[in-house]
Amino acid sequence: MVGYIGDIHISESDAEVAECLSAEYKRQNTSLQMIASENFVSRAVLQAQGSVLTNKYAEGYPGSRYYCGCSEVDVAETLAVERLCKLFGCKYANVQPHSGSQANQQVYMALLKPGDTVLGMSLDSGGHLTHGAGPNVSGKWFNAVPYNVRRDTNLLDMGEIEEIALRVKPNLIIAGASSYPRRIDFKAFRAIADKVGAYFLADIAHYSGLIAGGQYPTPFGYAHVVTSTTHKTLRGPRGGVIMTDDEEIHKKLRSAVFPGMQGGALMHVIAAKAVAFREAMSPDFKVYVSQILDNSRALAAVLATGGLDVVTGGTDSHMVVVDLRSKGLTGRDVSSSLERAGIVCNKNAVPFDTEKPWVTSGIRLGAAAETSRGLVVKDFEKIGQLVLKIVDSMRAGADMSVVESGVREEVATLVRVVPYDTLAC
C-alpha cells in the first residue's frame, strides 16, 4: 500500500522520537524517581495503553454510543467502571475524564453555577490549583475562598474551617491536597458541609491507592462526590475518574463529562485503567501500599533526625514535605542539585510560603515509585542520608559538582531497573 508505514518500527520511522523514548528510559533507570505524583505502571498497563484501542473513537457511554463499531470498547469501559466501583465500594463511577483536573472541572460544571462560592485548601497549605487557585479556571469562574493549615502544627484545623464555612456559606467544600502528608478527616468535612448546606467533594488524587490498600481513611460514605487521578499511588495510566453514591448526582456528572466538557473518550487509556483497577484489588497491592507507608515514614524520620524541618513533623501518606527556610535555601536550588545527583523530586510551596511558585521554600519527596521498584526501609533511610548530604553541603558552600557526582555514584547502587525496555522505544 503506497505511503502506509504502519508496520515500521519507530526507530526507523521517527528516529528523533525513538531517541527521546530511549533517553527517557535511561533517565528513569539511572536515577531515583521521588516525585510524589509519579509511579511505575505494570507491563500490562503499558500494553493496554499502547493497544489497538488507540484507533477507536467513541462518543457517549456503553450501550449508547454515537458511532458504530463500539462493541469491544464498551466491554473495556464497562470493566473499568465495574472494577472501580468494586475497588472503592461506591455505586456509580465515570472513567472517562482525561485527567484529575478535568474531573474536578466536570464536578463543578455538574453541581455549580458561575459565581458560586467554593471553599478549598490554599496552594501553600498543600491544596491543588483546581481547588480555587487564582490562575486556574476554578478561581476565575467561582468565588474561591481558601482555608489554611495551622501555623504552629501545619495541620488542618477543622474548627477554623467550620468558622470560615459558616461565614461564607460555600456551595461546595473541597477536601484533598497535592502536598498535605497527613490524614484527612472526611467525616468532619461532611459534618461542616451539612451545616451550611454545601456539596462535599473529596479529591483523593494523591491518596487513592493508599485508600484502596486500606492504609488511609476513605471518603466514601461522607463525600457527595469523589474524584481521583489514576496514576500516582493507584499505579495506573495518567487519567481521571469521578465516583458517587448518589444517582441524581451521577446523572449530572455523566452529562457534564459528555457532552459537557469532553467528546470522544480515550479508550486505550480506559482499558489501561481497567487493568490497573484489577491490579489494585490484588493482595500484592495491599502489601505494596503498606510498604509505601513504611518507606515514607523512614525517610521522614531520617530527614528530621538530620535537622531538616519536615512539614507536620512526619507523614501518614506516600509524601514527605520539607521546609528549607531554616536552612536559608530554596526549593528550586535544592531540587535542582538533587536532580543532578540522581534524586528526582520537586520544589514545593510550604505553609505560609512567601517565595514565588517557581522558587518555593520547600521540596516534596514521594515514596510510591521507588517502592514499586522494590526499595524498602533501609533504602529509603539511605536516600534520606543522601538528601541530607546535598543540603548540608549546599549550606557549607562546598563544591557541589564534586558532591553531586559522589551522591550519584551512591544512587546507582540503589536504582532497580524496571525490565520493560522492549517497550521503551
Curated annotation (Swiss-Prot):
Residue positions, PTM N6-(pyridoxal phosphate)lysine: K232
Catalyzed chemical reaction(s): (6R)-5,10-methylene-5,6,7,8-tetrahydrofolate + glycine + H2O = (6S)-5,6,7,8-tetrahydrofolate + L-serine
Entries under Pfam families matching the protein: SHMT
Signal peptide: none
Functional pathway: One-carbon metabolism; tetrahydrofolate interconversion; Amino-acid biosynthesis; glycine biosynthesis; glycine from L-serine: step 1/1
One Gene Ontology biological process: tetrahydrofolate interconversion
Any one Gene Ontology cellular component term annotated for this protein: cytosol
CDD domains attached to this UniProt entry: SHMT (cd00378)
GO molecular function: glycine hydroxymethyltransferase activity; pyridoxal phosphate binding
Cited function: Catalyzes the reversible interconversion of serine and glycine with tetrahydrofolate (THF) serving as the one-carbon carrier. This reaction serves as the major source of one-carbon groups required for the biosynthesis of purines, thymidylate, methionine, and other important biomolecules. Also exhibits THF-independent aldolase activity toward beta-hydroxyamino acids, producing glycine and aldehydes, via a retro-aldol mechanism.
Self-association state and partner proteins as the record states: Homodimer.
Protein name, entry field: Serine hydroxymethyltransferase
Source organism: Anaplasma phagocytophilum (strain HZ)
Lineage start: Bacteria, Pseudomonadati, Pseudomonadota, Alphaproteobacteria, Rickettsiales
